[in-house]
């Protein structure tokens, strides 16, 4: 399990349910028939982890299970691109879910293709650099600002270089009155 995910789960505690879309994290943490996850974990489609987590959160509310944390942990491809609509809906509906984006700035699992998280002028296999190209022609999408624009109560950026800060931000996100976003 990657260090960042260990830190997030350590902060969230054992009473946590995680939904993760297809992507680098899912491929490396669940080689059939095994799993690295030590909490209830749901593998969703690439585009709908936020919708799956929304259903989990509604079911927990229905059964008055307010002590269970619901997380989505997804990469930048599912967050910035393919699952963007479901995330927007989750934010808009106010589900009490912490969405953690594991941002490596490209579709790494399938060959380092550009995503909306890839920085301006960065080299990827689909945005090469050279005489005819400076690399990625688009600026990186500002997902934190988009979350703020949705009125998300808790939005933060973090780095595994600062583990104490990451843990603190996860704990704060779990006490938010509504959705939270950490990148």
Residue ranges and their predicted role:
Residues 1-102, 112, 117-122, 136:
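Cofactor-binding active-site loop characterized by glycine-rich and histidine/acidic residues
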Residues 66-70, 81-97, 102-183:
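Glycine-rich ThDP/TPP pyrophosphate-binding loop and its adjacent helix/strand module
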């Amino acid at each position: 399990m990657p260090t960042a995910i260990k830190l997030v789960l350590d902060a969230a505690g054992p009473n946590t349910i995680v939904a993760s879309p297809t992507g680098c994290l899912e491929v490396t943490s669940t080689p059939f028939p095994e799993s690295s996850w030590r909490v209830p974990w749901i593998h969703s489609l690439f585009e709908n982890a936020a919708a799956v987590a929304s259903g989990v959160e509604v079911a927990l509310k229905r059964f008055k299970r307010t002590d269970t944390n619901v997380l989505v942990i997804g990469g930048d491809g599912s967050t910035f691109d393919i699952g963007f609509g479901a995330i927007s809906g989750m934010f808009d509906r106010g589900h009490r879910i912490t969405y953690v984006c594991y941002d490596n700035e490209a579709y790494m699992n399938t060959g380092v293709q550009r995503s909306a998280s890839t920085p301006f002028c960065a080299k990827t296999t689909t945005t090469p650099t050279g005489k005819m190209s400076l690399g990625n022609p688009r600026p990186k999408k500002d997902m934190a600002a988009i979350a703020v624009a949705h009125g998300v109560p808790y939005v933060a950026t973090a780095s595994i270089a600062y583990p104490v800060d990451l843990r603190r931000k996860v704990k704060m996100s779990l006490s938010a009155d509504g959705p939270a976003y950490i990148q």
